[in-house]
Amino acid sequence: DLHMWKTYADQWSLHHKMDHENNIHTPELYAIWAQKAVFIDDAIKANPFKTDYFFWCDIGAFRDEHINPIICASFPTIHNLPKDKIAICSVTQLEGNDNTIIDEIHGNFQHTNRIVGGLWGGGIIGCLKWRQAFEDCLRLYFEKERFAGKDQSVMLSTYLANPTLANVYKPPNNYDWFYFQQLHSNLDIVAELDKSYIC
C-alpha cells in the first residue's frame, strides 16, 4: 500500500526496461527506494517521540559487525542536522557538466553515483520541503522518460534544481557510503561541506 507504488506502478514497470542493472533490481524495489521521503513524512505526522528532527537510515547501513560501539550507542545525533533543510552525503565530487539541464532536469546520473541515498535527514521543515521537491522531480523524470529507478539520481537532480534544500557533506575519504554513521554520532568529527556542491 505504498504511495510510490500505488501512484506510479506502471511507470516503475516501464523504467525497469531502461535499467542497465535490471537483472538485480525490480520495479517494486524502485518504489521502495522512492518511498523514503514519504516514510519520513509519515513519521513526522505520527511523531511519537515529539522530536523536531528525522533521519532516514537504510537497514543495510549497519551490516558491519565491527562497527564502532560509540556509533551504535549514539547514532543518530542531531548536531550536524540542519533545521530548515536536510543533510546529504557525497561519495564523489560534482563534475563540470553534472549540473547541465537537459529536458528541464539537472544532470544525468543513471550510470554514476555522486551522493548517498540511504542516510539523510534534517529538521521537520527541511524534510517536508524535501519530500515535496523530490516527488516533483520524480514526476518530471517520468514525464521526460528519464530513468528514475535509483533514488540517489533523482535526489541529486532535486538538490541541483534547488540547492537551498540540503547541505551536502564531504567524507574525509571519498566514496565512503557510511560516513554519516560517524558524522551523526558522538565521535569527534568535524563536519565539512563538499564545496563542489555549493552552487
Kindly give the residue locations of the regions a language model identified.
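Extended hydrophobic/aromatic segments used for targeting, binding, or gating
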Residues: 71-111, 129
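GT-A fold catalytic core of metal-dependent nucleotide-sugar glycosyltransferases
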Residues: 34-90
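Catalytic core and acceptor-binding pocket of nucleotide-sugar-dependent glycosyltransferases
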Residues: 61-63, 86-88, 107-199
